[in-house]
């Protein structure tokens, strides 16, 4: 016997007794918990409504046939806007405390340098761009051509 959690989004004008009677008629093993949740403002309109009411139910089911029958009936009913079914028995990690994350701790290793090592690390080479001045020479042919035209 599997335990399922069902959340149904209903039309705000709908009576929740209809949802409860549908659950009781579909699941022969019984409904463990039936709870009406608060009205919730929706992120977008569904059937020209900006609010919806939610129903939470925990049911016991003997097989997939009951779940399939509930989905079929919920899809037929126009006032059931959305539904979500979660299998609590096969859900891994439910009702378990969260595992602490493993943290990697870096250890600081002090290096030993002597003055001899320090002098070897400094390079005596010139920098790659030793001369930053432009080596471009002005063309004198252009200026001479202008003088000849005058």
UniProtKB/Swiss-Prot annotation:
Residues 92-150 are annotated as: Disordered. InterPro entries: Ribosomal_bS6, Ribosomal_bS6_sf, Ribosomal_S6_plastid/chlpt, Transl_elong_EF1B/ribsomal_bS6. Keywords: Ribonucleoprotein, Ribosomal protein, RNA-binding, rRNA-binding. Gene3D superfamilies: 3.30.70.60. Residues 98-109 have a biased composition (Basic residues). GO terms for cellular component: ribonucleoprotein complex; ribosome. Residues 113-129 have a biased composition (Basic and acidic residues). Pfam families: Ribosomal_S6. It comes from the Bacteria. GO terms for biological process: translation. GO terms for molecular function: rRNA binding; structural constituent of ribosome. Residues 132-141 have a biased composition (Low complexity). The keyword Phosphoprotein does not apply. HAMAP family: Ribosomal_bS6. Belongs to the bacterial ribosomal protein bS6 family. Binds together with bS18 to 16S ribosomal RNA. This is Small ribosomal subunit protein bS6. The gene is rpsF.
């Amino acid at each position: 016997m599997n335990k399922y959690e069902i959340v149904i989004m209903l039309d705000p004008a709908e009576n929740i007794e209809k949802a409860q009677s549908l659950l009781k008629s579909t699941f022969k093993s019984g409904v463990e918990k039936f709870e009406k949740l608060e009205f919730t403002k929706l992120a977008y309109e569904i059937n020209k409504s900006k609010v919806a009411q939610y129903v939470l139910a925990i049911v016991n089911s003997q097989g997939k046939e009951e779940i399939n029958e509930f989905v079929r009936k919920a899809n037929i009913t126009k006032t059931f806007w959305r539904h979500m079914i979660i299998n609590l028995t096969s859900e891994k990690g439910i009702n378990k405390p969260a595992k602490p994350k493993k943290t990697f701790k870096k250890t600081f290793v002090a290096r030993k340098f002597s003055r001899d090592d320090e002098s070897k690390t400094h390079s005596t080479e010139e920098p790659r761009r030793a001369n930053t001045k432009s080596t471009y020479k002005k063309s004198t042919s252009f200026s001479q051509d202008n003088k000849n035209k005058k």
